[in-house]
Amino acid sequence: MHGPSEGVSEETDEANSAVKIVGGNVFVELDPDHPGFKDEGYRSRRNEIAKIALEWNEMSMDERRSKKIPHAPYSEDEDAVWAAIMERITPVHEKYACKQYLENARKLGLPNDRIPQLQEVSETLEEMTGFRQEPVGGLVHPKTFHTALANRVFLSTQYIRHSSRPFYTPEPDVVHELVGHTAMLGVPEWAELNVLFGKADMRTESEAAINRLGSVYWYVLEFGACRENGEV
């Protein structure tokens, strides 16, 4: 995931600019106003999950295709956060989401009572459109994100928002990725549009061009509305 104009200075293959190696240990930087900033248990799990992403991205593409994504460690409280979100958002989706989203959400069959592991969801998605989901530690450079799309890979976070703010997250989390994106990636036309964005970004040569393309992606595929049966 990335923002509409993330002009970070790291190399474009950097997995996540917020993940640091400190004294040989993986450390996720959180802003002081982040809901989980003072929660040592939450931060420890975030670091462990970030390590999964870093080690995954050290492998070659061929290696990643032949291996399963390691399971992320989730607590009972975090499973409860997922359950609370699903309870609230499911009826909202039934009322407002488009037909294709609802059809593919049913095919995915995301559990209501626990956070699904990225590997199990990715396997189902791959059967639908050939797209796979692979882990990243957090926000990534737009070119990193788009180049993955060209290879039918959607980079996804595995951590979940803090339990003190279950209906808000300051960063894309596993709810955002799996509930927000995966169902639509199961729509063939939508999947191909993502691939085209990725191929277009592979032709960009400047940071300004990358950010302009990222803004188009942000307001077309990340956020947007559609007209269906005469209603928006």
Regions found by a protein language model. Give the residues of each.
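The feature captures two recurrent sequence modes
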Residues: M1-L185
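A contiguous, surface-oriented mixed alpha/beta subdomain in the mid-to-C-terminal portion of proteins
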Residues: R161-V232
